[in-house]
């Protein structure tokens, strides 16, 4: 498990942790989730930075996101390795995908074999994953999503 939000201390492992709050009323797994407050900034989201970085041997990144809206919401997912971070590589040098969240809970899975092949001209170093980000682009109004049970398998 990369993050299950059962303790408040877990929130500090995320970049933009000030946008996160432990939540007990909307939960997918266990007794807590993370409330992710998103703004109308061009890009608004959170990034997991402090976690086991060796993902070699895992096939899936799984997590659950609750969409409180009455309609679909586009959520972007980004994975990058230490080389991308070190060289400030371009968009094409990392894994990017857009997920469409339906209202309510969405149980999502990222195929790590696809992520490994995503950087143009090279393979992502799955033994040195540097960040996992979830974000929205140019939201029209502030919005809170709920994130739970982030894990590898």
What is each model feature region?
Residues 1-153:
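Beta-rich carbohydrate-recognition modules and glycan-binding surfaces
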């Amino acid at each position: 498990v990369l993050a299950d939000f059962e303790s408040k201390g877990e929130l500090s492992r995320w970049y933009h942790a000030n946008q996160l709050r432990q939540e007990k009323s909307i939960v997918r797994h266990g007794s807590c989730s993370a409330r992710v407050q998103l703004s109308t900034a061009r890009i608004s989201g959170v990034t997991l930075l402090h976690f086991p970085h060796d993902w070699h041997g895992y096939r899936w990144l799984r997590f659950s996101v609750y969409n409180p809206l009455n309609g679909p919401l586009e959520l972007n997912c980004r994975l990058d390795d230490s080389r991308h971070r070190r060289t400030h590589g371009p968009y094409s040098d990392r894994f990017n995908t857009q997920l469409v969240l339906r209202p309510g809970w969405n149980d999502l899975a990222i195929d790590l074999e696809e992520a490994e092949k995503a950087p143009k001209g090279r393979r992502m170093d799955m033994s040195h994953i540097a960040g996992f980000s979830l974000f929205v682009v140019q939201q029209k109004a502030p919005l809170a999503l709920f994130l739970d049970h982030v894990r590898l398998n």
